């Protein structure tokens, strides 16, 4: 029988990053040093964010201890700066599973990535000035994931984290004049699609609840 054009095959991809925004999560360690965690497992519901972070990452440890973070949302031109810090960790010594992936310790990811730190209004961790959207947040809940049957025994697992957004900062260039709305014609988030970086294309339509 000829293919209909909508037939599907069963595959087992190594990752399910089908297309989510990249975020740079800034936190403070116990000495007050700032860390940047690049990640892409984040989604929003009203004024809440839900994140998935590695259970052995420095950023996760900082957030669980300090209860505060800034979720900075970059645009596509920042992808090269993000990749400069991608294979680094604030943890020392470097966890075994990250050593196996070629990670190295980096105490100052701001300098390595060429990022500018700027003070937050309501939380201690700094914002990243280059990111067009910067969300100050406080921790509400955290839950460790349940291992699956196929999970590697050496995999550190991940933590599901719920955050409350307490302040939103935006570059004026992406805000509609005289409003509180982000101009979707000017704002293009950096997307992570099966470990590749993309921006958004032209608008295809609008949801019935859109206010602009």
What role is predicted for each listed range?
Residues 1-212:
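Basic, polyanion-binding surface patches
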């Amino acid at each position: 029988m000829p293919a209909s054009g909508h037939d599907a095959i069963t595959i087992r991809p190594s990752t399910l990053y089908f297309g989510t925004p990249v975020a740079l999560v800034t936190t403070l360690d116990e000495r007050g040093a700032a860390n940047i965690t690049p990640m892409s497992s984040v989604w929003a519901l009203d004024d809440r964010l839900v994140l998935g972070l590695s259970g052995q990452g420095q950023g996760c440890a900082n957030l669980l201890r300090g209860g505060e973070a800034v979720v900075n949302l970059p645009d596509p031109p920042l992808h090269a700066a993000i990749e400069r810090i991608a294979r680094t960790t604030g943890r020392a010594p470097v966890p075994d599973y990250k050593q196996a992936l070629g990670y190295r310790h980096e105490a100052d990811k701001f300098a390595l990535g060429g990022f500018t730190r700027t003070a937050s209004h309501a939380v201690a961790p700094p914002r990243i000035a280059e990111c067009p959207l910067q969300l100050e947040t406080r921790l509400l809940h955290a839950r460790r994931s349940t291992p699956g049957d196929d999970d590697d025994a050496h995999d550190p697992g991940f933590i599901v984290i719920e955050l409350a957004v307490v302040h939103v900062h935006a570059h004026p260039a992406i805000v509609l004049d005289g409003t509180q709305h982000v101009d979707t014609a000017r704002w293009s988030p950096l997307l992570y699609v099966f470990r590749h970086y993309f921006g958004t294309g032209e608008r295809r339509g609008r949801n019935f609840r859109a206010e602009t």
